[in-house]
Amino acid sequence: MKKLYFPHQIERIVQQHWNDNQTFSVTEDKNKQKFYCLSMLPYPSGNLHMGHVRNYTIGDVISRYQRMLGKNVLQPIGWDAFGLPAEQAAIIHKKNPSDWTYSNIQYMKQQLKSLGFAYDWKRELITNDPQYYRWEQWFFIILYEKGLVYRKTTLVNWCPYHNTVLANEQVINGGCWRCHTKIQYKKIPQWFIKITHYADQLLNGLNQLQYWPEQVKTMQRNWIGQSTGTNVIFKILNSNITTITVYIARLDTFMGISYLTISVDHPITLQIAKINPDLANFISIYNTISIQLHNKQFICHKKKGIFTNLYAVHPITFTKLPIWVANFITPLEFDGQGAIASCPAHDQHDWEFAHQYDLPIKPVIKYADGELPNITNQAMIEPGILFNSDNFDDLTSHTAINYISKKLIDLKIAKTKIFYHLQDWGVSRQRYWGVPIPMIKLKNGIIQPVPKSELPVILPEIIYTKNNENNILSKNFNWTHTTYKNQDVIRDTDTFDTFMESSWYYARYTCPHYHDGMLQSDAANYWLPIDQYIGGIEHATMHLMYFRFYHKLMRDIGLIQSNEPAIRLLCQGMILADSFYYISNDGQKNWVSPNKVISTRDKMGHIIKSIDADGNNVIYAGLCKMSKSKNNGIDPNAMIQKYGADAVRFFIMFAAPAHSTLEWKESGIEGALRFLKRLWNITYQHIQNGLIHQLNMYKLENKHKIIRQKVHETIIKVTDDIDRRQSFNTALAAIMKLFNDIQDIFPINNTQDRSVLHEALSIIVKLLYPFTPHISYILWKELGYTNTIDDTTWPTPDLQAIQTQEILIIVQINGKKKKKIFVPINSDKNTIHEIAKQAIYQDKNLESKYVHKIIYIPNKIINFITK
């Protein structure tokens, strides 16, 4: 064993061993309990960032720990290769996106290997491989045949920068989730998958996800947005349009309905607009507002409306109800009806609209204590007791709902339904770099799937030029024009939303080389569901929703048996770093890398002045999420080259709880490296002392028992921290404390001392292995074990060692440690004082001093204060 710790040397050796022996490659073994650990699929953007490192280190710690428990552990890796960044890079460099993608994959693969992650590289997937996406195309056709796929022309979110459709989930604050460009709205034909048919299953399934974060489940519940309401048919007076179906959220307010409101896209609106120029103009102004409302972008817009000159009839009171078109009603809500019955006395939106256009307001609910509502300044929205409601007077809101519902059903004009905020998944994208949609258009206009025997429909290789940056597939005549049964047909030139590829990749990992189907059922059912999934909470209503949906689709066509894709989900927190900028002459913020900034701090450590490498006075913007936009990212390669992979892994897992934000401090990696060096040095000194004798359990002294107690208590704590609590930072803190305690307590005087130390060091190395596998591999070997640490089991606590009869007390004089004493575990304060006094009075320096105060911290320290 070398005297000094050189992390890069040992990491290369250990990684080569893992690579040569394919240590972490696995197959199905029904005699072993499986454990499938997976971190979310990375996009090959060119470089790993620290967010990647955190995600994958968490997964690797869990995987290695579970492997030491004797489980058959699958931890695969692959690449989410399609998407806009590759296409944008190809446009800039005038080349094919695959060149950029594969170059990035090679570099990022080297980065992952340099961190020592225990991946089964034989299962590596790349989603732009035709042998991967052929099964995605096949699956889409199966769903089409089952009636779960349809095509319709619809108003969509459109990103003018990327020239493509965005799903509702991909619109953030009115802008594209990638480039933040303000979205526009277009009507174009789109392919949809009926995720709404699975709304109940997606909602109810959340109750079975016991080990998912509540925040994620709440976000999904809200996105699915289940509510119960009633559709009621109203007759229309004096019109060739005879009826209208409207949505009513609260039937207890039914007797107070004073007008009806419909969306700008409602069929009645569009029909009347043909003969009403004012309404047609209103539609031209507001025809995108309702979809903005659906996307939660319409908060600050003023409510606008226009009267249709039509009246409906209240089916119970027979009151005439004016029908208005309003800009705040979405056609996508209320089961697609886009029409509501408005009771302004008891709904704030309706109240505001009624006041603006001087519409009738009829209160019909009073407070539960009988007080009449004051609706002068706002609506009264609480449930209560009905009045002003004919036969329903004096009923509570809850009771009235049932009575009014029965009345309307008896009249055969109402149907109570469950409604969802969730909309069908639009999967068409007007981009080149994606999976071709396997549909063709015949000469007679019929659209149908490509024959399954002709799959995959392979994306052609196209080089970008100035003339073909948009709709590049549609301009490729040789690809778009093909034949079917000896007739000319045209291919669909849209590609799939890239969330399609990432919705089923986890299942393909179970059988990546299977050529006869989408999944090999025995392998898929052996490994699935995933035991531990890891990724950011920002995916809660996009990837994690589609991921669950796809799993149920695959189950329902018989590919898999389980109901949910992952048993346990861990959402790691963001990584924050210092951020600096200066204002340029044109008033723009120029963000400066923290590596190029020199800062002056006050006594409290706060930054008071900063200058960059060019001499600019820069402004400290605080701790912000690491990002390219703020130029505050840290290159993992630079940290690995400077400190070694184990130190980086240690810091990432130690600096903060896994689910919390982590504040990046390079000094933290320096501290991790110092600890690993200390561990190396102590182990080196121990080994240099020669042969280790087997521990004699019958000749244990008090100090031995204390050390063994601490060691085996630490095993219990670290096991619980990693396994049940997933509190990895406290696990590492416990290991460090144990190491420090050993050094404090334990002078080495004889072979029994060395045997106890050997046991302690061996267990520390085992406990550290999931976190710092390279140094652990070498130290385990140097401690004399013939099997590699990769093949060892997790340490089991010796319960007898924990049940010690004595405890260690540190004796201090004026706060400085002088002695260690062992006292019976149940000793009272006076007994401990006497034993401690006898120990310290052996110190000649105390003879002329007077002890005037004794401070005792139970079971830890006794401190004698002298004059």
From Swiss-Prot:
Residue ranges annotated as motif 'KMSKS' region: 625-629
One GO BP annotation of this record: leucyl-tRNA aminoacylation
Pfam families found in the cross-reference section: Anticodon_1, tRNA-synt_1, tRNA-synt_1_2, tRNA-synt_1g
GO MF annotations, alphabetized: aminoacyl-tRNA deacylase activity; ATP binding; leucine-tRNA ligase activity
Positions that bind ATP: K628
InterPro entries registered for this protein in UniProt: aa-tRNA-synth_I_CS, aa-tRNA-synth_Ia, Leu-tRNA-ligase, Leu_tRNA-synth_edit, M/V/L/I-tRNA-synth_anticd-bd, Methionyl/Leucyl_tRNA_Synth, Rossmann-like_a/b/a_fold, tRNAsynth_Ia_anticodon-bd
Annotated family: Belongs to the class-I aminoacyl-tRNA synthetase family.
Protein name listed in UniProt: Leucine--tRNA ligase
Provenance organism: Blochmanniella floridana
Top-level taxonomy: Bacteria, Pseudomonadati, Pseudomonadota, Gammaproteobacteria, Enterobacterales
